[in-house]
Amino acid sequence: MARPAKALIDLDALRYNLKVAIDLSQYSKIMAVIKADAYGHGAIGVSKALSDNVDAFGVASIEEAIELREAGIKTPVHLLEGTFSDDEITIASKNNFSISCVNQKQKNAIIEAQISVPLNVWIFVDTGMHRLGITPEELISIYKDLSASDNVSDNIIIATHFSCADDLENDFTSTQLSRIKNAMKDLSVNTSFCNSAGLIGWPQTRADWNRLGIML
């Protein structure tokens, strides 16, 4: 019978990795992505180790967000995939979770929700990752609809996700950056483009927010 496997998480190493990220980010804010139990490292322990030096945590589900709050984490929490029911929108509003809007259905649900506290919304635009997000052509109309809603705070953020930023010889990251900038050229808003590979290898993509997971 094999011995049980044990993973030892070096929180000092995580803190050092975050310091490197902060130095690279300069004046950008940092969202530490800790979905899937911080990729198996333990979301609670990781979030407690990093909470003093990040601006937000990114998670995949409402359950992950609630887990952080119940553990006493006060740092802002963002739902990267948005919400999937009216109940989740209500919970996000009550707990001050920011949420993504990745399609027309989510946009309509946000606008039609019965909530008293406006939501901070990030609009994700699919510029080539093809995982989630609205099309670049939809951006202006969706932005206008959300901006006009009392359910949405004034600080809407526009985001995209790079598909191959870890390949420095593939210029598709530059193509994606051009697509998002063209789509939002008539908007004056905060933005979030960088994942870990983008922050390290493509400094021209650094924006108001950097969303970092693997490099931490």
Regions found by a protein language model. Name each.
Residues 1-3:
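Gly-rich Lys/Arg/Thr-decorated short loops/hinges at beta-loop-alpha junctions or inter-strand turns
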Residues 5-9, 13-16, 28-193, 205-206:
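Active-site-proximal beta-alpha core segment in soluble small-molecule metabolic enzymes
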Residues 24:
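Conserved PLP-enzyme active-site core in the AAT-like
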Residues 196:
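Short, well-ordered beta-to-alpha junction loops that form the rim of enzyme active sites
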Residues 200-216:
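Active-site loop ensemble at the mouth of alpha/beta enzyme cores that anchors a bound cofactor
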